Amino acid sequence: SSDVCSSDLTALLITQTGGGCRASNYIHLLRKALVKAGYPQIPVASLNFSGLEKDSGFQMTLPLARRALACIFYGDMLCALRNQVAPYENEKGAADKMVDLWVERLGRVLLAGKGYTSKEMKHTFPLIAKDFAAIPVTRVPKVKVGVVGEIYVKYSPLGNNDLQKFLESQDCEVNFPGLMGFVQYCAFNMGEDHVL
């Protein structure tokens, strides 16, 4: 146990699309792994809109969905700007420091229940962009690499063997598609399934 986080006060939340991908099975594997690791008291709840795991104890409400979407927008923006600036920055680490600064700022704002409305986001997005634009860079031609694939493998350094770090060490500009595209894909598929 940690001083910061008690396993008795911890729960895991996993998203499930309800589609045919293997990620829909991860919740069962997580539960088995927690029991095997000695943490049977930690519940694993499912976040989905397709009716899976109806008794998971977690219900998505409209206000919570709005907050989650705002966080995805902010996260996508920070990742995109960081990846556009970092390969060209004059001072190594400046883009990562800017990400950390904005994660801290946004964390305080969001925890205070602000920053979720369209008006607040429209105010904040240009401020974030302005801060990244102020980082001194030297634009030189670089190979641009787009990373696609399964969500976990694409975004997790553990799952992709630190692919972004490797590509950047090879003097590449790395681009990950935003998570919002996946959210839109899931929403569209749900709509299509309903029509069918």
Each model region followed by its residue ranges:
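An N-terminal assembly and electron-transfer interface module characteristic of large anaerobic redox
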Residues: 1-196
